[in-house]
Structures are given as C-alpha cells and as structure tokens.
Swiss-Prot record:
Source organism of this protein record: Lawsonia intracellularis (strain PHE/MN1-00)
EC number of this enzyme: 6.3.5.-
Function noted in UniProt: Allows the formation of correctly charged Asn-tRNA(Asn) or Gln-tRNA(Gln) through the transamidation of misacylated Asp-tRNA(Asn) or Glu-tRNA(Gln) in organisms which lack either or both of asparaginyl-tRNA or glutaminyl-tRNA synthetases. The reaction takes place in the presence of glutamine and ATP through an activated phospho-Asp-tRNA(Asn) or phospho-Glu-tRNA(Gln).
Protein's name in the database: Aspartyl/glutamyl-tRNA(Asn/Gln) amidotransferase subunit B
Top-rank EC class of the record's enzyme: ligase
Reactions the enzyme catalyzes: L-glutamyl-tRNA(Gln) + L-glutamine + ATP + H2O = L-glutaminyl-tRNA(Gln) + L-glutamate + ADP + phosphate + H(+); L-aspartyl-tRNA(Asn) + L-glutamine + ATP + H2O = L-asparaginyl-tRNA(Asn) + L-glutamate + ADP + phosphate + 2 H(+)
Isomerase is among the record's keywords: no
HAMAP family (alphabetical): GatB
InterPro entries listed in its UniProt record: Asn/Gln-tRNA_amidoTrfase_suB/E, Asn/Gln-tRNA_Trfase_suB/E_cat, Asn/Gln_amidotransferase, Asn/Gln_tRNA_amidoTrase-B-like, GatB, GatB_C_1, GatB_Yqey_C_2, Gln-tRNA_amidoTrfase_suB_CS
Gene responsible for this protein: gatB
Biological processes, Gene Ontology terms: glutaminyl-tRNAGln biosynthesis via transamidation; translation
Record key words, sorted: ATP-binding, Ligase, Nucleotide-binding, Protein biosynthesis
Amino acid sequence: MSHFEAVIGLEVHVQLGTKSKLFCSCPTTFGTPPNTNICEICAGMPGALPSLNKLAVEYAVKAGLALHCTINTHSFFSRKNYFYPDLPNGYQISQGTHALCTSGYLDLTIKNNNKRIGIHQIHLENDAGKSIHSPHENKSFIDLNRAGVPLIEIVSKPDINTPSEAVAYLKSLHAIVTYLGISDGNMEEGNFRCDANISLRPYNSKHLGTRTEIKNLNSFRNVQRALEFEINRQQDILEDGKTIIQETRLYNSDKDITTPMRDKETAHDYRYFPDPDLVPIYVTIQEIEKWKGEIPELSDSRQKRFVIEWGLAHQDAEILTSSRELADFFEKAVKLYPKPKKIANLIKILLLHMLNEHNITIQQCTMKPEAIAELAAIIDENLISIKIAHDIFEDLFSKQLMPKDYVIKHGLTQISDTKTIDTIVVEVLAENPTEVAAYKNGKTKLLSFFIGQVMKKMQGQANPALVNQALHNILSK
C-alpha cells in the first residue's frame, strides 16, 4: 500500500472557435497547406502590430462565467519570453500574470462522491506554430498556420488527487466548452489538450512535493495512463530514498512511459513583462451581463433535469447529455413522441452504435429526431418488433428514410394474427419432439429456443408476446 498521495494540477488549452486568429485576420482553418494561413503578424515580422480579436474575449468570459470565476473588468497581455523554433516572435503573448478570469471552481460527482476543483485562472493566449520532423531527410520544417490561433488556458488549483479525478474533470470541462459553443473540443486536432503537473506527498501532509510536468496530453486515455505511470515512477523514487527532479516530461503512448524533455521552467525564467503593443482589455459590467444571459443550459444541470423531468436513469442521462447536439436530438424526439425512456433506449442501442460504426459524430448525422420518434411509435403500436427495428435501422440511418413508410413498402409489418402464429408454433413443436419432451420434463429454458425457431420461420415478423403466449398454451396441453 502506498504511503503517498498524488497532488495534480491541470493546465487545459482550449482552441477557441473563432474564424480568425487572436491578433490578426488570418483564418484558423485546420488542415490547409503549410504556411498558407499566415501574415506578417503570424510570422513575427518587425513592426507588425497586433490587433485583438474581440470575439475571443467574449468566449473567454463565457468560459469564466460557466466556471464561476470572477471576471476582471481590467486585464492585460504580457510577453512570455522563451525560444522555440515554431515561436517566431521569440515570445508568446499571454495573460499569465493578470488574467481575464480568476478564482472559479468546477463541481464533480465521482462514484456518488462530490468534489470541488478550484480554478486558479482562465487567460487568453496565442498558440505557437508546429514543428514537423522528417527523419528521412534529416530535416525539420516549420508550419506557422497554427501560430496566433486563439487559446484559453484553464489553470486548475492542485485539488486533484487521482488519474480518474483528472479525467472526470477534463470530461466535464470538455462538455462545458462544447456546450458553450466556444470550441469544438476536437482532441485529435489539438483543440483540447492539457499539461499535467504532478507531485507526491505523504498522506495527511500539507507540504507540496517536487513536481514534474507532463506536456501536451491530447486524449482522456493518455491523461489516465500518463498520470498512472508518473505516480508509480515518483513513488518508486521516493521509496528508494531518492529525490524527484523538477522537470518537464513527455508521455510516449506506444511505450506507455514518460521521458525527460527539459528542466522545468519557473515564472522567472520567462521574464514576463507587459506587451507594449497591446492596450489593456476593458470589459464592462453590461457586456458581462449580456454574455451571461447567452449561456445555454450546461451539461451538468441538463443531466439533472433529464433525471427529474424525464425519469431517466443517471447513467442514461449522462450519456444523452455528453454533447449538446445529442441532448438536443433526444429532446426534439421526446417532444414528438413523449416516451422518454423508449426514445433514450433507441438512441443508446441503435443510433449511437451506428454513429460508432460509421465513425461520425451526432453533428454529422443525417438521421432526424422525427425518424427516432416514429420508430418508437410504430414499435409501441405493434406495427414492428424490436428485432425488425434492429434489422432495418442501417437502411433508415444511411438513406434518411422514415420508418413507417419503409416498413409498409417492404412488407415488414408485424404479424399479430393468432391463427397464423398458432399454425407455425405447432409446426415448430412437431419438428422438435426431443426438445418438447425435455421442456415438459422441467427444462423450461427451452422456451427461448422455441421462440427463436418460430421467429426464424416467420422471418422475425411475428409478435413476440403472441408467440410466447401461443407456446405456453400449446405446451401446457
């Protein structure tokens, strides 16, 4: 058993969904040819003066409001000085010392336990470019398309103690920024990534240990695995009586290890000073109130409402509110056919499975809530069985068809004629005398076998309840 407690703080970088960069009008479009979305400001040319993107300020304030921060009406930008090949100015424009949003929090519920994670600050900054390494040519290339893209950095307090808590915190943050519409949160494109600071200390100690930082973690799985490895690594060092080195490390997902990158910098190393080319940011109380009024219902409160208003299980509500678009889809379907539990099951079992199969998001889905609502209705009307619903869903999904028309056109309506069902049941029992004898001798689980055989003969179109009833009636004679 470990004698140490992990202390974790996360710095989450969220790319804001503005069309232009933070200090110029260059587009932020992902995937364009290298060095096409750049200008003199992106490239750090002498004399090129930045001009602040006001929408980025609005998005940062909305994030601060959603995370219960104090919104500072007066903040300013500083230059964070360090050398890196893809940082053309030789400094990053940030708000490390005088942030727009400070002193917030995020409440989590993890395995029925509530925990509050403090937010130290949220500040605006511009992203760096990208280094592209070509081992075959023994060269490195610089793409400045990303240079100047607007970010907010959400800095937590060191209130996180386990990798699972860290992942829960990140998932909740991800839901918030996507619900707000300030970022698409695309982790594969680097639009939501984090650096993790971690140290160990003896249980019940208030003293913080020497920390290491793990850079650029871009998936929830990588955060979990990297923190688990680093906790074990530091624990082994401390138990051997050795000292933790304060350093920056990288996580290698292929080898599932962290490796040293460089010594860990401190604020003094960056020589922060106010940027002389940018005026301070002034935000009025009226602007703050306006933006506050535009914040939608967020995932946490929506999840609670789904449980109370629609009677859903907590787990189902959590799944359905995992994205704003999915929650909207569910509610639109329920308004059309007010059977929330049935709608929820169809979305969970059929729609989400199909999205995974096609590797697309709900935003890319062409199926309409009307189709799910109608599918639920015709199942309840006994027009089709659940099995038929499963069988036809691929076509409904891929071809944007309405269920009732499809079922009638293809002759797939459920058979509820008792005489027809009785006839097929008698045939099935006659074909399986050994199983019938075993059933009558107490092997009642064979009922499922008989149901399956009847459904097979009737191509899945028989009413399952009537098949069950017919089997019971005939077998009891």
